[in-house]
C-alpha cells in the first residue's frame, strides 16, 4: 500500500487549481492510493525475455505523398484576429502570475 496522504492530495489540488472539500480530499486520497497500488503491481510481473513493444498487435501507419498546398500568409491569418502584436495572436491571460 502506498499511503497517499490527504495533505499530498491537497497539494496536488492546489497545483491543479482545484477547490476540494475535506470529504473529497479523503476520497481522492483513497482512490489515488488504490491507483498507485494497481500500477505498481505491473512492476511485479515476470517479463524476463519478453521483447519491449508499444502495442500488443502490429500497427501499420499508412503513408501518403506530401503535397504542397496553398496556405495563409501570417498577415492573412492575423487579419481576422481580434488582437495581434508583432506577428503573434494576442489572447487573454488565463493563468496567474506564477507567484504561488
Swiss-Prot record:
Enzyme class: ligase
The protein's name in its UniProt record: Aspartyl/glutamyl-tRNA(Asn/Gln) amidotransferase subunit C
Annotated GO MF terms: asparaginyl-tRNA synthase (glutamine-hydrolyzing) activity; ATP binding; glutaminyl-tRNA synthase (glutamine-hydrolyzing) activity
Keyword Protein transport attached: no
PANTHER family: GLUTAMYL-TRNA(GLN) AMIDOTRANSFERASE SUBUNIT C, MITOCHONDRIAL (PTHR15004:SF0)
Described function: Allows the formation of correctly charged Asn-tRNA(Asn) or Gln-tRNA(Gln) through the transamidation of misacylated Asp-tRNA(Asn) or Glu-tRNA(Gln) in organisms which lack either or both of asparaginyl-tRNA or glutaminyl-tRNA synthetases. The reaction takes place in the presence of glutamine and ATP through an activated phospho-Asp-tRNA(Asn) or phospho-Glu-tRNA(Gln).
Family statement: Belongs to the GatC family.
Keywords: ATP-binding, Ligase, Nucleotide-binding, Protein biosynthesis
Pfam families: GatC (PF02686)
Subunit structure: Heterotrimer of A, B and C subunits.
EC number: 6.3.5.-
Catalytic activity: L-glutamyl-tRNA(Gln) + L-glutamine + ATP + H2O = L-glutaminyl-tRNA(Gln) + L-glutamate + ADP + phosphate + H(+); L-aspartyl-tRNA(Asn) + L-glutamine + ATP + H2O = L-asparaginyl-tRNA(Asn) + L-glutamate + ADP + phosphate + 2 H(+)
GO BP annotations, alphabetical order: glutaminyl-tRNAGln biosynthesis via transamidation; regulation of translational fidelity; translation
Amino acid at each position: 500500500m502506498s499511503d497517499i496522504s490527504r495533505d499530498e492530495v491537497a497539494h496536488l489540488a492546489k497545483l491543479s487549481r482545484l477547490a476540494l472539500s475535506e470529504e473529497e480530499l479523503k476520497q481522492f486520497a483513497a482512490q489515488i492510493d488504490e491507483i498507485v497500488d494497481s500500477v505498481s503491481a505491473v512492476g511485479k510481473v515476470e517479463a524476463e525475455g519478453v521483447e519491449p513493444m508499444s502495442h500488443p498487435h502490429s500497427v501499420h501507419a499508412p503513408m501518403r505523398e506530401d503535397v504542397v498546398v496553398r496556405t495563409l500568409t501570417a498577415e492573412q491569418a492575423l487579419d481576422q484576429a481580434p488582437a495581434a502584436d508583432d506577428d503573434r495572436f494576442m489572447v487573454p491571460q488565463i493563468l496567474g502570475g506564477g507567484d504561488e
